[in-house]
Structures are given as structure tokens and as C-alpha cells.
């Protein structure tokens, strides 16, 4: 057989977290969550230069533009907060209910940034065996419009007056809900933990009136967590799962699922069996995609793609493990930084340093007759009959020209 000539751009994947300094920089919030009770999953928000973090002890903030800034207690002191939404001077906060009682006191409204607040939990929630709210989503252009998902009596509820009145949209009990940021008539709900071994995903294209099941588009037992939306192409979405990365190019109508252990490469077990809960397209360069997750008995991990989610680097891991399960609560972006909120701390990661550590580019020309080559879907290719494109060869991504 005539040797196949390859013009190869090799992207060398580094195997460790630390190449040039510490990649995961702890911000030292000083409030650990080593004991996960129920579904307590506090969230964070970036407002201008200020990071706001929900904790089991209230709402805290830090000025990200000032490296010397200290954490400040904003409000809701001593209250375990799941999430919050802001409309002008008002904050609507979701209190986590450790007691699993349905007596209310889990929807709090403040008019002064959380220094004082009142319980505005409506009777509709007290009368429906609802113990707390799993999640909250705010409309991207109408801040008084919110979605919440309830537990254990399932339901997605919508308010258009910042929590004064609510309307039930469905009986689902999702882990994640959200509006499409560029087309908020599109609403999604997904249950990352799977339901009866099926990957639970519903999408509404009319503001929650009609919901379409998308289970058949996804592998069983794959999981699907919070969806990230491309910043310029509204049709492109991406989400992590368990063992999988899920993508769609048509507004969620059809999905492609990439199994992360398909390739015969040395990091497949490091990406396998991780709950990849949070994904993000880079706000400035959406070819760069980030995925954060954790799992029982594993470090918190972060992986990166530089080709829009087609291929992924070997996961980087957070080097300070304090709990048997390093659960990841949230991931946000701020300028050139990723912010990851886990049980042990809030971590800051330089995007440029992450990309630099992910790939080192060398241009060489090589001839390999017996090289084992796979396409990006993990299928073994027959050497000598390859069209131009991207492939995996010897644990490296190569471009054949």
C-alpha cells in the first residue's frame, strides 16, 4: 500500500494542571459546603464587576476588578440561599429548606439588597407539597418574568410580576430550567439525573404552552445538564452529561451526543463517569468551549475544546480535594476569567492560560503507513483512504491536508 502523506497540525495535550503557575486560583470565600443535604446547589451571578455568591450563610459579594478586594456579606445573613433574581432595587431569593417542610418561608423578597426581607411564599406553593425550589431562571429582557422549578411536587411556574403571582406551566421536576437568551419564547427543562434511565429533556417554543419531548434524540442513561447557548448563532446549543457532550445546531430539534470514552486515548477514564454539569461557549471566541464537573470520589474537573466542542482536551483537575464528592455548583465568565463554584471554594481560571495549557501547536509533515487513526466520532479509519479533515491519531488531534 502506498504510504499516505499527512500534513499534520498536532495539538499536544498537557496531562497536569500546573504548567505555568496555578491554574485554579481559589478566591477564599471561606464558606465550605462539605455536607450536601438534599438538593442544595447554590448559584452565583456576575453583575458588572461584582460577583455575588449564594451560600448556606447568606449572599456574599466580591469586586472582581480589584485583586485586593475582600468578600462582603451583602444580605440574607444566616439564610441558606439557592439562587436569586434582581429587578431594580428588589431581590427575590430562594431559601433552601433543609427541614423539607411545606410551610413556606422559602421565597424571600428584599427591597434593600438583602439587609431586610419578607417571606412572600404564595399559598399556591404551600398547598401543593412543595418543600423548596430547585432552580430559578430570569427572562433576559423582562426582569420581572421568572421561572422556578419545585420539589418534591413537580412543577415549573412562571411569574410576570416578580413573584407576586404565579402560573403553573408543567408538572416536570427538572434539575435545570432556562430561557433561550436570544429567543426567550424558547424554554427548556432537563433532569441531569435521568428518569427511568432516559435522558429527560423537554423544550417549549411558545413560552411554555406546549412542550416537546426530546428523549428520543439522546442516548439512555446519558444525562443532560444545564444548556449553554452560542453567543452569536442562536441555533447552536451545548450541554454536558454523564459520559457525554450533547450538541444541537437547529435550536434543539435534533441532537448529536459524543461519548467521551470512545477514543483509545489515555484520558478517556478521566472524562468518563464525570457529571459534566456546566458548559460555556467563550463570550469572545465561541470556538473555545469549557465544561466543568465532578463526581463521587473524584476531583473537580475542567475540560476545554478549541474547535467548538468537536474534540476535548484531557481534563484539568482542581488540586485541593477536601470532600469525598467535589460537587460543582456553578460556572460563570468574567472578562478573561472562568469562575467555578464548588464545595471547597470559588475558583478563578485564566481563559488564556487554560487555552495555552490545552494545546501546543507544532507544524510537521509526516508519513505513517501503520498509524491508527480515528474520526472525531471515534470510528477507526482505514489508513490510506482519508479525505482532508480532522482526525485523532496517537492520542492527538491531527489535520490531514
Language-model region placement:
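C-terminal outer-membrane/trafficking sorting elements
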Residues: 358-401
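Entry beta-strands of beta-propeller and related beta-repeat scaffolds
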Residues: 49-53, 89-93, 142-148, 183-189, ...
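Conserved Ser/Thr-centered positions that define the repeating blades of beta-propeller domains
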Residues: 61-65, 110-111, 159-160, 181, ...
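Trp- and S/T/G-rich repeat-edge/linker motifs of beta-rich repeat architectures
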Residues: 22-39, 66-79, 115-126, 164-172, ...
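Short glycine/acidic-enriched loop and turn motifs that connect beta-strands
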Residues: 58-60, 97-102, 152-154, 193-197, ...
Amino acid at each position: 500500500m502506498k504510504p499516505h502523506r499527512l500534513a499534520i497540525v498536532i495539538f499536544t495535550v498537557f496531562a497536569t494542571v500546573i504548567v505555568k503557575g496555578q491554574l485554579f486560583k481559589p478566591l477564599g470565600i471561606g464558606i465550605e459546603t462539605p455536607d450536601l443535604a438534599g438538593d442544595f446547589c447554590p448559584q452565583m451571578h456576575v453583575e458588572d464587576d461584582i460577583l455575588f455568591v449564594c451560600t448556606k450563610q447568606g449572599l456574599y459579594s466580591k469586586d472582581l476588578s480589584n485583586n485586593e478586594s475582600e468578600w462582603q456579606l451583602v444580605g440574607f445573613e444566616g439564610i441558606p440561599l439557592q439562587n436569586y433574581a434582581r429587578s431594580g432595587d428588589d431581590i427575590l431569593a430562594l431559601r433552601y429548606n433543609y427541614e423539607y417542610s411545606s410551610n413556606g418561608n422559602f421565597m424571600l423578597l428584599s427591597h434593600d439588597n438583602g439587609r431586610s426581607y419578607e417571606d412572600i411564599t404564595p399559598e399556591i406553593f404551600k398547598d401543593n407539597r412543595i418543600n423548596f425550589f430547585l432552580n430559578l431562571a430570569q427572562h433576559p429582557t423582562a426582569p420581572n418574568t421568572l421561572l422556578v422549578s419545585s420539589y418534591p411536587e413537580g412543577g415549573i411556574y412562571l411569574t410576570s410580576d416578580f413573584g407576586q403571582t404565579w402560573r403553573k406551566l408543567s408538572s416536570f421536576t427538572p434539575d435545570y430550567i432556562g430561557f433561550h437568551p436570544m429567543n426567550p419564547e424558547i424554554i427548556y427543562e432537563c433532569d441531569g439525573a435521568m428518569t427511568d434511565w432516559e435522558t429527560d429533556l423537554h423544550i417549549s417554543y411558545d413560552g411554555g404552552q406546549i412542550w416537546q419531548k426530546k428523549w428520543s434524540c439522546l442516548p439512555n442513561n446519558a444525562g443532560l445538564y444545564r444548556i449553554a447557548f452560542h453567543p452569536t448563532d442562536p441555533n447552536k446549543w451545548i450541554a454536558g452529561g454523564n459520559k457525554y457532550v450533547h450538541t444541537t445546531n437547529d435550536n434543539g430539534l435534533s441532537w448529536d451526543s459524543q461519548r467521551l470514552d470512545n477514543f483509545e486515548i489515555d484520558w478517556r477514564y478521566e472524562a468518563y463517569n464525570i457529571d459534566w454539569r456546566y458548559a460555556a461557549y467563550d463570550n469572545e471566541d465561541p470556538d473555545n468551549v469549557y465544561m466543568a464537573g465532578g463526581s463521587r470520589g473524584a476531583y473537580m474537573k475542567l475540560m476545554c475544546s478549541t474547535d467548538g466542542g468537536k474534540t476535548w482536551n484531557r481534563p484539568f483537575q482542581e488540586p485541593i480535594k477536601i470532600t469525598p464528592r467535589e460537587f460543582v455548583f456553578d460556572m460563570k465568565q468574567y472578562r478573561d476569567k472562568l469562575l467555578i463554584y464548588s464545595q471547597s471554594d470559588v475558583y478563578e481560571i485564566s481563559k488564556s492560560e487554560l487555552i495555552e495549557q490545552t494545546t501546543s501547536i507544532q507544524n510537521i509533515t509526516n508519513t505513517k503507513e501503520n498509524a491508527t487513526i480515528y474520526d472525531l466520532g471515534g470510528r477507526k479509519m482505514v489508513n490510506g483512504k482519508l479525505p482532508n479533515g480532522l482526525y485523532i491519531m496517537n492520542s492527538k488531534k491531527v489535520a490531514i491536508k
